[in-house]
Each structure stands twice: as C-alpha cells, then as structure tokens.
Amino acid sequence: MKNKSVEMLIEGAKEWGIFLEMFHVEHFQKYYALLLEWNQKMNLTAITEESEVVIKHFLDSLSVVKSGKIKEEEKIIDVGTGAGFPCIPLKIVFPKLKATLLDSSKKRITFLEEVINKLGINEIELIHGRAEDIGKDIKYREQFDLSVARAVAPLNILLEYTLPFVKVDGYFIALKGREIEEEIENSQRALKELKGEIEEVKEIKLPYSDIVHHLVIIKKIDNCPTKYPRRANAIQRSPL
C-alpha cells in the first residue's frame, strides 16, 4: 500500500484506541494484496481502491473494538464472514482471540485459507457451511463469548442466524448502517424469542469519510429455544 494509505490506516486505527506496529501494517498490506489477487478470480468485494479498502473494510472492521466487548483469548465467531470482515482485521490486531469464521461459499473459505497461511494467523477455524445448520451443532451452539456479523440482512433475520452461537451472558455485535431505528423496532419479537436484549447502540463515524454506521450490541440473557435457528426458507419466508 502507498504511504498515504498506510498513514490513514495507522491514524484511523488510533481513533478506535488501536496503536498499530509495523508488523500489523505489513499484515494488512499482505491481506490487501491477496484481496486484489483473488478478487480477479471471484467476487470478493466491489471495493478495491486502496484508500477505500482501508476505510470501508479495515477501519470499519476494527470499529468493533468501540463496543468494548473485544477481549483477548475469548471465543468469537464471524457469521457470514465473506472476505474475512470483520474478523481477519480483528485477528491481526488481537492475535490471541480464538476466532471461527463461517461462510456458505467454499470459494471464499479457500481464499481465507490462503490469507491465514500467508499471514501466519493461529487459533482460527474456518467453516464452510450455513449458519442455520452449524448453529444446531453442539460443537458450536452457545459456545462463543461473542458473535459478529457485517451482513446486509435485516437485524431480525441476523439475530436468528447469530444468537444461537452465543453463550448466555455473551454478546452479538451487528455492524449496521446509518438508519437503524426501524430495524431495531422490527426486531423486538426476535429478541424476545431468541433471548437477547439490546444493551447499547453506538454511532460510529468512519475516519476520512462522511460514513456513519452503528454497532448494535446485544446481550444473550438465556438459552435459545432448540427450535432456532429454523431452516433458511422458513427464516426468509416468515422472519421473527
């Protein structure tokens, strides 16, 4: 990456209270190079310009630390990780996080295997599968301190895919856009059914841009009923 983009990454991360060393920067540079290389073979991201990737992918992912819920050595699952956002940037900065990245695309999982090998990332598991299936598996169900998702699905749908992974007293953090009030209003039934409650909604302004988004911080207050998550067609046809 050019010096300007590196400076944006370093200074932008400081706004989240993150102080990057050069080895962190080198990891982000390798990640960016792999993203560009593999994006020519498959659809990973429409955002490829260097400074845009720094702002809209790297700094956006790192904004999760503003939730106050990122703690070293805790177990985190990234549901629908895509090209690895937000969990790969978080693992670069917090290498002791025990991370699981879940995606339904085998091609994207293959890309992520290359990323973690080239970056030498440890304590990370990649799963090719669907959240509604893996969320029923006792190996993963209610096993995580934290789940995160940057997916574009409405919050009430995301909750059914993500909360079954979270331990009681753990958290789900949804990275959502500027307009969030209606989504929250439409999620009250899902929160009640899935045993979650909104603890806080934090407004985040991305550095070097006019982009505003929100972190919706949801606490798991009890065990999810075993009937959730339902099959994908049921979730889409009649969301909670």
Swiss-Prot record:
Gene3D superfamilies: Vaccinia Virus protein VP39. Its main location: cytoplasm. One of its GO terms (molecular function) is rRNA (guanine-N7-)-methyltransferase activity. S-adenosyl-L-methionine binds at residues 80, 85, 103-105, 131-132, 150. It comes from the Bacteria. Keywords: Cytoplasm, Methyltransferase, rRNA processing, S-adenosyl-L-methionine, Transferase. The keyword Lyase does not apply. The keyword Cytoplasm applies. One of its GO terms (cellular component) is cytosol. It is an enzyme of class 2 (transferase). Its EC number is 2.1.1.-. It is found in: Cytoplasm. Specifically methylates the N7 position of a guanine in 16S rRNA. Belongs to the methyltransferase superfamily. RNA methyltransferase RsmG family. NCBIfam families: rsmG_gidB. This is Ribosomal RNA small subunit methyltransferase G. The lineage of its organism: Bacteria, Bacillati, Bacillota, Clostridia, Thermoanaerobacterales.
